[in-house]
A protein has these predicted regions:
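Short, Lys/Arg-enriched C-terminal cap helix and immediately downstream tail that follows
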Residues: 306-316
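Short helix-coil junctions and helix-kink-helix linkers
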Residues: 48-50, 154-158, 287-292
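Short acidic, hydrophobic short linear motifs in intrinsically disordered regions
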Residues: 41-46, 148-149, 280-282
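Short, hydrophobic/amphipathic alpha-helical patches that form generic packing surfaces
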Residues: 24-32, 132-140, 271
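Structural motif
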Residues: 15-23, 123-130, 260-264
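DNA-contacting interfaces and partner/effector-binding or oligomerization modules
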Residues: 57, 61-82, 87-213
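Extended mid-to-C-terminal alpha-helical interaction segments
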Residues: 198, 202-299
Length: 319
C-alpha cells in the first residue's frame, strides 16, 4: 500500500466524537466527491463516490452516527482499469434534505436542493471542526508522495472557490499552502517536509506522522553523512594533488640543480616527502629529526615549490 493509502486508511478509522465535527467532515465529503441528484418529481438524493472501500465505510458510518440514517452502498467495477468505485447513497428525499440542511449546503427552511451553497464558515468555525473538514477533504480527493522520494501533499478541487476555501483553512494553521491550476482542476498543495508533518498532525494521522518523521530523520542523517564524506573526499583530493605537485617540484630541483645547492632544512623536507609520498603534513613533520609542526613543514614545502618555479623560469621551462 502506498504511503498516501496508509494515511487515508488511518484517517478512515478516526470518527470524531463531537456531532459538529462529524458534520464538518461529512460536509467535506459531499463538497469534494458528492453529488445531489434531483429526479423529475423534484425529489433529491445524495451520492458520494470513492475508490477507497474504507472511505466509503467512513461516510456510511458518519451518516448513520450523525443522523441515524441508513444509507446504501453500491459497487461499480471497471474491468479494463481493474478498479472499483463505491457509492454511498442517501435515497430518501427527507433524509437528503436533513443532511444538506445540517451541512448548511441549503437553507434551514429550504425543501429542495436546486441551489447548493458553498462551505458555510459556521461549519468550520471551531478548530476541531477545521481539523475534521481537512481530514474529509484529504480522504475524498487528496494524495501524498512517498516521503522516501519527495515531500508533496495535495488536495484536488473541481472549483476555484473550494480550492481557496481549503487553502485558507490550511493557512489558518500557520502554514503556507498554495494553489496551482492543473488541467481543469485546482490543486491545493504543500511541499515542505515540516509542513506536511504539521498537516498530518492537524488531521490527526499520528501513526503516519511518526512514520514520516522517521523517514525525515534517516534522510537527514544520510545527507549529513554524505556531506561529511564529500568534504573528506574533497580534502583528500586536495591533499593528494598538493603531494603530487610537491613531488614533481622536488624531483625537478634534484635533477636540475641538485640537493647540495638547497638549504639543509629544505632538503630534509624534500627527502621526507620523497620517502613518504602519501603522508600528511602532520606525519611528514613528525618524521623529521627534530620533529616540526604542520605549519613548519608546509612552509618548507612551499619554499621548495617556489624555488622550483623560479628555476623553471630561469631555464625557460613551463610553469
Amino acid at each position: 500500500m502506498s504511503f498516501s493509502g496508509k494515511v487515508k486508511e488511518e484517517l478512515a478509522r478516526n470518527i470524531g466524537s463531537a456531532r459538529h465535527c462529524q458534520i464538518a467532515e461529512l460536509t467535506a465529503f459531499i463538497g469534494m466527491c458528492g453529488t445531489v441528484v434531483i429526479n423529475s418529481f423534484d425529489r433529491c438524493s445524495i451520492k458520494i463516490r470513492t475508490e477507497n472501500i474504507l472511505v466509503a465505510r467512513k461516510v456510511f458510518t458518519l451518516i448513520e452516527k450523525t443522523f441515524n440514517i441508513r444509507s446504501d452502498i453500491s459497487v461499480r467495477r471497471n474491468i479494463k482499469k481493474q478498479t472499483e468505485t463505491y457509492s454511498v447513497i442517501v435515497k430518501k428525499h427527507e433524509d437528503a434534505i436533513r443532511i444538506l440542511q445540517a451541512t448548511k449546503m441549503i437553507g434551514e427552511q429550504q425543501e429542495n436542493a436546486e441551489e447548493l451553497h458553498a462551505v458555510n464558515p459556521m461549519i468550520v468555525q471551531q478548530v476541531c471542526c477545521r481539523r475534521a473538514f481537512l481530514r474529509g477533504t484529504f480522504q475524498a480527493s487528496g494524495s501524498m508522495s512517498d516521503p522516501n522520494k519527495a515531500y508533496h501533499f495535495e488536495i484536488v478541487c473541481s472549483t476555484e472557490e473550494m480550492a481557496h476555501q481549503i487553502c485558507d483553512l490550511i493557512c489558518s494553521f500557520s502554514m503556507d499552502a498554495k494553489i496551482v491550476l492543473r488541467k481543469k482542476s485546482y490543486v491545493v498543495y504543500l511541499k515542505e517536509g515540516a509542513q506536511i508533518v504539521d498537516i498530518l498532525n492537524i488531521m490527526e494521522a499520528h501513526i503516519s506522522l511518526m512514520e514520516l518523521e522517521n523517514v525525515r530523520i534517516l534522510k537527514e542523517m544520510r545527507n549529513s553523512v554524505n556531506r561529511k564524506v564529500n568534504c573528506e573526499t574533497a580534502n583528500i583530493n586536495k591533499t593528494v594533488s598538493a603531494a603530487v605537485k610537491q613531488l614533481e617540484d622536488i624531483t625537478y630541483l634534484r635533477d636540475q640543480i641538485g640537493f647540495e645547492n638547497i638549504p639543509k632544512g629544505l632538503v630534509e623536507a624534500a627527502l621526507a616527502r620523497l620517502e613518504h609520498p602519501e603522508a600528511t603534513l602532520k606525519e611528514l613533520g613528525e618524521s623529521l629529526n627534530p620533529p616540526v609542526g604542520k605549519s613548519g613543514i608546509n612552509h618548507r614545502l612551499r619554499k621548495l615549490s617556489e624555488m622550483a618555479d623560479k628555476v623553471r623560469q630561469e631555464q625557460g621551462g613551463l610553469l
